[in-house]
């Protein structure tokens, strides 16, 4: 198999400046809604990139849980590698690959922790099994076998068979305050359309970038 021979044309249509919303959050919500309507698998899945203390980058797929004018929100174990890295360096990058629509969105910004009240509101809305899993898994730690994790889950399931499950102190969310948001639309002959929104003291500048 020759990887260099794997290619296709992008035919979904171009993106013009006049098509864009003035606010990139509004534009993002429009594209996200269209991704959902297109029946895409996991349209809220995004790559979250962070760096460790030595500048080594790490990436993982995380689900976006909310977005508004204040930023993009996701939740995680606060002892996880990404949370620890954000504690040392709050700079972060998000990437949404909406391949069926021939679109990408790339976001850079700064991550800040959510308030305990915000964490509690979302935690209590989760399915019971998801709440238990958040307690059972010490994310990114080494375990001897999957059975250890499953055993802990069953133990907690029996313990909290009745009543509410307490939110663990080591679980919570981050809000990514965007500094830049780039919208990418595939184009014919590799002449893709790219528009970069840059936050300048609360106002958004828009630039077209070469593909």
Curated annotation (Swiss-Prot):
Binds 1 FMN per subunit. One of its GO terms (molecular function) is FMN binding. PROSITE patterns: PYRIDOX_OXIDASE. Coiled coil: none annotated. The keyword GTP-binding does not apply. It comes from the Bacteria. Pfam families: PNP_phzG_C, PNPOx_N. Pathway: Cofactor metabolism; pyridoxal 5'-phosphate salvage; pyridoxal 5'-phosphate from pyridoxamine 5'-phosphate: step 1/1; Cofactor metabolism; pyridoxal 5'-phosphate salvage; pyridoxal 5'-phosphate from pyridoxine 5'-phosphate: step 1/1. Its cofactor is FMN. Signal peptide: none annotated. It is an enzyme of class 1 (oxidoreductase). The keyword Flavoprotein applies. One of its GO terms (biological process) is pyridoxine biosynthetic process. Keywords: Flavoprotein, FMN, Oxidoreductase, Pyridoxine biosynthesis. Catalyzes the oxidation of either pyridoxine 5'-phosphate (PNP) or pyridoxamine 5'-phosphate (PMP) into pyridoxal 5'-phosphate (PLP). Homodimer. This is Pyridoxine/pyridoxamine 5'-phosphate oxidase. The gene is pdxH.
């Amino acid at each position: 198999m020759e990887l260099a021979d794997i290619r296709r044309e992008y035919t979904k249509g171009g993106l013009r400046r006049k098509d864009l919303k003035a606010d990139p959050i509004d534009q993002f919500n429009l594209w996200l809604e269209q991704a959902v309507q297109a029946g895409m698998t996991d349209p809220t899945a995004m790559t979250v990139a962070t760096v460790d203390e030595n500048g080594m980058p790490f990436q993982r797929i995380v689900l976006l849980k909310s977005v508004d004018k204040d930023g993009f929100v996701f939740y995680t174990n606060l002892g996880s590698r990404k949370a620890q890295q954000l504690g040392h360096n709050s700079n972060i990058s998000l990437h949404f690959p909406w391949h069926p629509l021939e679109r990408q969105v790339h976001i850079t910004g700064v991550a800040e922790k959510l308030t305990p009240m915000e964490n509690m509101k979302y935690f209590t809305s989760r399915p019971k099994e998801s709440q238990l899993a958040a307690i059972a898994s010490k994310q990114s730690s080494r375990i001897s076998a999957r059975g250890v994790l499953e055993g802990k889950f069953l133990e907690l399931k029996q313990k909290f068979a009745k009543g509410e499950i307490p939110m663990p102190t080591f679980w919570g969310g981050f809000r990514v305050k965007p500094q830049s948001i780039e919208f990418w639309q595939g184009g014919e002959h590799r002449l893709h359309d790219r528009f970069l929104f840059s936050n300048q003291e609360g106002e958004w500048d828009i630039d077209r970038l070469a593909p």
